[in-house]
């Protein structure tokens, strides 16, 4: 008697998780294969390596939030702009610094977020 694929799937569905794990292990041993997906692991490692290579970052102010005065002070400290220019930048948002090192970008983001701003680092 030959079983159909549907009958096999139904029989597996009735088994407990432990029984299915034992079945998978037995199939791996019998046919010399692995149920793991090595292609997915290799693909996931590629983008991570590309992220580590980035050395220059752009710090962008998205929103000043509720504490505009604190954000304006932080913008002035980071950019060296005058009060009016810093106020305009804080209210409108925009790029604060391009080509910043990772450490500088993280410090700017930390300082601006502490002041109440929403910041994006790319």
Swiss-Prot record:
One Gene Ontology MF term: structural constituent of ribosome
GO cellular component terms attached to this protein's record: cytosolic large ribosomal subunit
SUPFAM superfamilies for the chain: ClpS-like, Ribosomal protein L7/12, oligomerisation (N-terminal) domain
Pfam families: Ribosomal_L12, Ribosomal_L12_N
Free-text function comment from the UniProt entry: Forms part of the ribosomal stalk which helps the ribosome interact with GTP-bound translation factors. Is thus essential for accurate translation.
Gene Ontology BP terms: translation
NCBIfam families in the record: L12
The keyword Transcription is annotated on this UniProt entry: no
PANTHER family: 39S RIBOSOMAL PROTEIN L12, LARGE RIBOSOMAL SUBUNIT PROTEIN BL12M
Similarity-based family: Belongs to the bacterial ribosomal protein bL12 family.
Assembly with partners or alone: Homodimer. Part of the ribosomal stalk of the 50S ribosomal subunit. Forms a multimeric L10(L12)X complex, where L10 forms an elongated spine to which 2 to 4 L12 dimers bind in a sequential fashion. Binds GTP-bound translation factors.
Organism: Stenotrophomonas maltophilia (strain K279a)
Keyword Ribonucleoprotein: yes
Keywords tagged on the record: Ribonucleoprotein, Ribosomal protein
InterPro entries, A to Z: Ribosomal_bL12, Ribosomal_bL12_C, Ribosomal_bL12_C/ClpS-like, Ribosomal_bL12_oligo, Ribosomal_bL12_oligo_N_sf
Protein name, UniProt field: Large ribosomal subunit protein bL12
């Amino acid at each position: 008697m030959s079983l159909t694929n549907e009958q096999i799937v139904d029989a597996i569905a009735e088994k407990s998780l432990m029984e299915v794990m034992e079945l998978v292990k037995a199939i791996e041993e019998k046919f010399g294969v692995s149920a793991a997906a090595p292609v997915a692991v290799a693909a996931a490692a590629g983008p991570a390596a590309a992220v580590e290579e980035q050395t220059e970052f752009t710090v962008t102010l998205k929103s000043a939030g509720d504490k505009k005065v604190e954000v304006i002070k932080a913008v002035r400290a980071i950019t060296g702009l005058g009060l009016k220019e810093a106020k305009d930048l804080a209210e409108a948002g925009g790029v604060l610094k391009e080509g910043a090192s990772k450490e500088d970008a993280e410090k700017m983001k930390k300082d601006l977020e502490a002041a109440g701003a929403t910041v994006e680092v790319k």
